[in-house]
């Protein structure tokens, strides 16, 4: 931990189980979500945010509200809103968004994430058409499509991704499409077979953290499986760039991050994002360190030395943040 990140001011409130009756169909967030996972969230001193952590408040310009109105009119969800992304004001203000398909209830309960958990609703058969119309209406040149985990579906939602990609290309043939997919655990080969029908322009799947912290941060996921997903997709689609992202601040070391980056390159991952983890609430995993800008710069330099075609590295970087610029600099658009 750097000296500038060591200013502890208060102790985070420990999570205690909610007294609300459990309803599997309701969307659980914050304490209602994290109190029921088999991972103990250990209270930690709340660190003072350093000067380099600056989040722009959501601005009320016309483009911001235009996007929100169009999304609601088409019954669409963005991960920007559901995950409480700190960059939502900037991105919506510039007319960009990351669309989240297959509902707003995830079958996983990752304690770093603010997306709600619950028994998902049936897939909306009109969503691919509504999504494609929205993208065309907004005249977007580059879009990111992501989703909740859908462990309840036999293909993990792969066919729904393909339907969204193909319909978007039909209405907006010049638009480049990046997908940020779940891990399709237990159905990987089936999902890859389906994605082969209509592959995206960029294939993204986040490793999120170092393998030592997977049990704590990504219950239900597997580090080796996530690497295999990207490597196997690349083997089938050698001309489609692959991408993955990491958070820092969960208790990892710099060397562990570098080791994950080496693993990424050994599994033919082309593009990289690294950003600072910011806890959505006191009921999520605590921030254990704020990484200094000099360290982010070191990660970026090492990334290019390792052969990544593009590395977006910095405190406020998120997987989809300025994804169009990342793709452009990597030669995709």
Curated annotation (Swiss-Prot):
Its EC number is 2.8.1.8. It is an enzyme of class 2 (transferase). Its cofactor is [4Fe-4S] cluster. SMART domains: Elp3. It comes from Ralstonia pickettii (strain 12J). It holds the Pfam family Radical_SAM. Coiled coil: none annotated. It comes from the Bacteria. Residues 91-309 form the Radical SAM core domain. Belongs to the radical SAM superfamily. Lipoyl synthase family. One of its GO terms (cellular component) is cytoplasm. The gene is lipA. The lineage of its organism: Bacteria, Pseudomonadati, Pseudomonadota, Betaproteobacteria, Burkholderiales. This is Lipoyl synthase. Disulfide bonds: none annotated. InterPro entries: Aldolase_TIM, Elp3/MiaA/NifB-like_rSAM, Lipoyl_synth, rSAM. It is found in: Cytoplasm. It catalyses: [[Fe-S] cluster scaffold protein carrying a second [4Fe-4S](2+) cluster] + N(6)-octanoyl-L-lysyl-[protein] + 2 oxidized [2Fe-2S]-[ferredoxin] + 2 S-adenosyl-L-methionine + 4 H(+) = [[Fe-S] cluster scaffold protein] + N(6)-[(R)-dihydrolipoyl]-L-lysyl-[protein] + 4 Fe(3+) + 2 hydrogen sulfide + 2 5'-deoxyadenosine + 2 L-methionine + 2 reduced [2Fe-2S]-[ferredoxin]. [4Fe-4S] cluster 2 binds at residues 106, 110, 113. Binds 2 [4Fe-4S] clusters per subunit. One cluster is coordinated with 3 cysteines and an exchangeable S-adenosyl-L-methionine. Residues 1-29 are annotated as: Disordered.
């Amino acid at each position: 931990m750097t000296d500038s990140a060591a200013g502890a001011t208060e102790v985070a409130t420990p999570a205690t189980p909610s007294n609300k009756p459990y309803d599997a169909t309701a969307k659980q967030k914050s304490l209602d979500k994290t109190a029921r996972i088999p991972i103990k969230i250990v209270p930690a001193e709340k660190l003072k945010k350093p000067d380099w952590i600056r989040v722009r408040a959501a601005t009320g310009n016309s483009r911001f509200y235009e996007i929100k109105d169009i999304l609601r009119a088409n019954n669409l969800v963005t991960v920007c809103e559901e995950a409480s992304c700190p960059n939502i004001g900037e991105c919506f203000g510039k007319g960009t968004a990351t669309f989240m398909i297959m509902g707003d209830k995830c079958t996983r309960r990752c304690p770093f994430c603010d997306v709600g958990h619950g028994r998902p609703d049936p897939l909306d058969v009109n969503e691919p058409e509504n999504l494609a119309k929205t993208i065309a209406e907004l005249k977007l040149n580059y879009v990111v499509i992501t989703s909740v985990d859908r462990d309840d579906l036999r293909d993990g939602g792969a066919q729904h991704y393909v339907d969204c990609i193909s319909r978007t290309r039909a209405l907006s043939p010049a638009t480049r499409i990046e997908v940020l997919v779940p891990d399709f655990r237990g159905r990987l080969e089936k999902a890859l077979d389906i994605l082969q029908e209509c592959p995206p322009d960029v294939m993204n799947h986040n490793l999120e953290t170092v393998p030592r912290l997977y049990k704590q941060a990504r219950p239900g996921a597997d580090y080796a499986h996530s690497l295999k997903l990207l490597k196997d997709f690349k083997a089938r689609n050698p001309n489609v760039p692959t991408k993955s992202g990491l958070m820092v601040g969960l208790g990892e070391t710099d060397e562990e991050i570098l080791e994950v980056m080496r693993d990424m390159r050994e599994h033919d991952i082309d593009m990289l994002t690294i950003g600072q983890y910011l806890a959505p609430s006191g009921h999520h995993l605590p921030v254990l360190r704020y990484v200094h800008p000099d360290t982010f710069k070191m990660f970026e330099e090492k990334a290019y030395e390792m052969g990544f075609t593009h590395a977006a590295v910095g405190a406020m970087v998120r997987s989809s943040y300025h994804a169009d610029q990342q793709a452009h600099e990597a030669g995709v658009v």
